[in-house]
Amino acid sequence: LHEQTLEDHTHILGPHHPDTLASRNNLASAYQDAGRLEEAIALYEQNLEDRTHILGPHHPDTLTTRNNLAGAYRDAGRLDDAIPLYEQTLEDSTHILGTNHPDTLISRNNLANAYQDAGRLDDAITLHEQTLEDHTHILGPHHPNTLTSRNNLASAYQDAGRLDEAITLHEQTLEDRTHILGPHHPNTLTSRNNLAEAYRAAGRIEDAEKLFEPSSGAEDEQDGTEHNPGQKTDS
């Protein structure tokens, strides 16, 4: 469907029309979700070039495309390519939209996750702490994005061996998600697995066994919904 839409928009509107660029972004997103990363990256790179040329490097749609390309690079393990794009996007978003704009908070979270993937834990923790503080202040302590930020900070603490701090945050997040989302919501299950992994890392095996479901380790999360409309998919 996305391929047909892009073909039609390109034929009818031309390759540089905003609707064509939006269709190309959506096809790239679908490729990324399907694990077809090389195809996704090629489309995102083309879109970034076109949007930069047509809209300018600081237009919100250009920032979204740069963020999306960085995410595809990250998924492909190309952290050296992803991190500079995330850094540039955060800088531009902060300057254009403001420090506390939701898209700026998303950009900061994404950069923190990339730093964490690259083993730059001090940098990741600094950004995660700032993002959690801002989300708590702006959205409240129980907003889903705040809970995601708390989960991600706990994950970074855990990677850094700061297990007591990680466990405290994981316990708080699990309690809040169970109360707000219900015990069987996917994010609640993620929190339960992450807390179990932290317990196990701390040698608290009995506590872990009470919670544990198979998991490859503490999972970080994208800010907001799985595919935040403001960051990934154009309408």
Regions from the language model: what does each represent?
Residues 1-235:
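Intrinsic-disorder-linked linear interaction elements in eukaryotic regulatory proteins
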